[in-house]
UniProtKB/Swiss-Prot annotation:
Family, similarity comment: Belongs to the G-protein coupled receptor 1 family.
Taxonomic lineage from the root: Eukaryota, Metazoa, Chordata, Craniata, Vertebrata
Protein name: Olfactory receptor 8B3
Gene3D superfamilies: Rhodopsin 7-helix transmembrane proteins
N-terminal signal peptide: none
Residue ranges annotated as Extracellular topological domain: 1-25, 76-99, 161-197, 259-270
Membrane topology per record: Multi-pass membrane protein
GO biological process: G protein-coupled receptor signaling pathway; sensory perception of smell
Amino acid sequence: MLARNNSLVTEFILAGLTDHPEFQQPLFFLFLVVYIVTMVGNLGLIILFGLNSHLHTPMYYFLFNLSFIDLCYSSVFTPKMLMNFVSKKNIISYVGCMTQLFFFLFFVISECYMLTSMAYDRYVAICNPLLYKVTMSHQVCSMLTFAAYIMGLAGATAHTGCMLRLTFCSANIINHYLCDILPLLQLSCTSTYVNEVVVLIVVGINIMVPSCTILISYVFIVTSILHIKSTQGRSKAFSTCSSHVIALSLFFGSAAFMYIKYSSGSMEQGKVSSVFYTNVVPMLNPLIYSLRNKDVKVALRKALIKIQRRNIF
């Protein structure tokens, strides 16, 4: 528990998304539905990709890992977030908070680079189709995936390590629904200069490098699509490409906006914008990247038919 003045904080209180009592119950059911849809969608795709050998290709390999990341990082904070809507005081221990911070950052940063790998995969498939099998070999895909997780581990370790060196004295109310970097820095009673420099460097790298790489990849992809002679083929490619760009913009845009708003002191706007990359995007990813795909639809239809036949007999 929190002791008196000049003593160290051993637990935090998560303020949650809103302090308006009339919104608590509706928001609980809303985010519960979002979480269930996220879990079912991503877990379903993981099982589908694992059981269907014809989906063991580079594109679906990255989608498998994306679903795994979304499944994990939604589960890192959502249970605590839901508790905040139904309990008067949502308490998390110091150790629990640092653990949540580490795994949240690990999965979020890993997702940034997994999305980058997926954009590169689409670039090679559309712009250099004849070299696709050679360029996107199993070894290359494994290296890109491993690199994504390594970047996630490095970023999470840097931020959490710097956070552990701080001292938290009297203030223990985190103005957020999860343990995140900037809300925690505001509570420290010691200098946060080193942490702020690390945030500037690490967050800058993990947002700018993936977003610029993805942007360049999609510029080349759009250029190639414009050379497609078939109007139907061109419109279909643009439809797929635009949905991907919207999902990516939501993820990177809301993450960048949240850090900008928290840095400028607009905490409430920062919390609301964070909902998009923490809750909305993991729910939409299966629909945008997988369930609109013809091969996935066929595999899903076959799986549902098998389940129906088993139930009949």
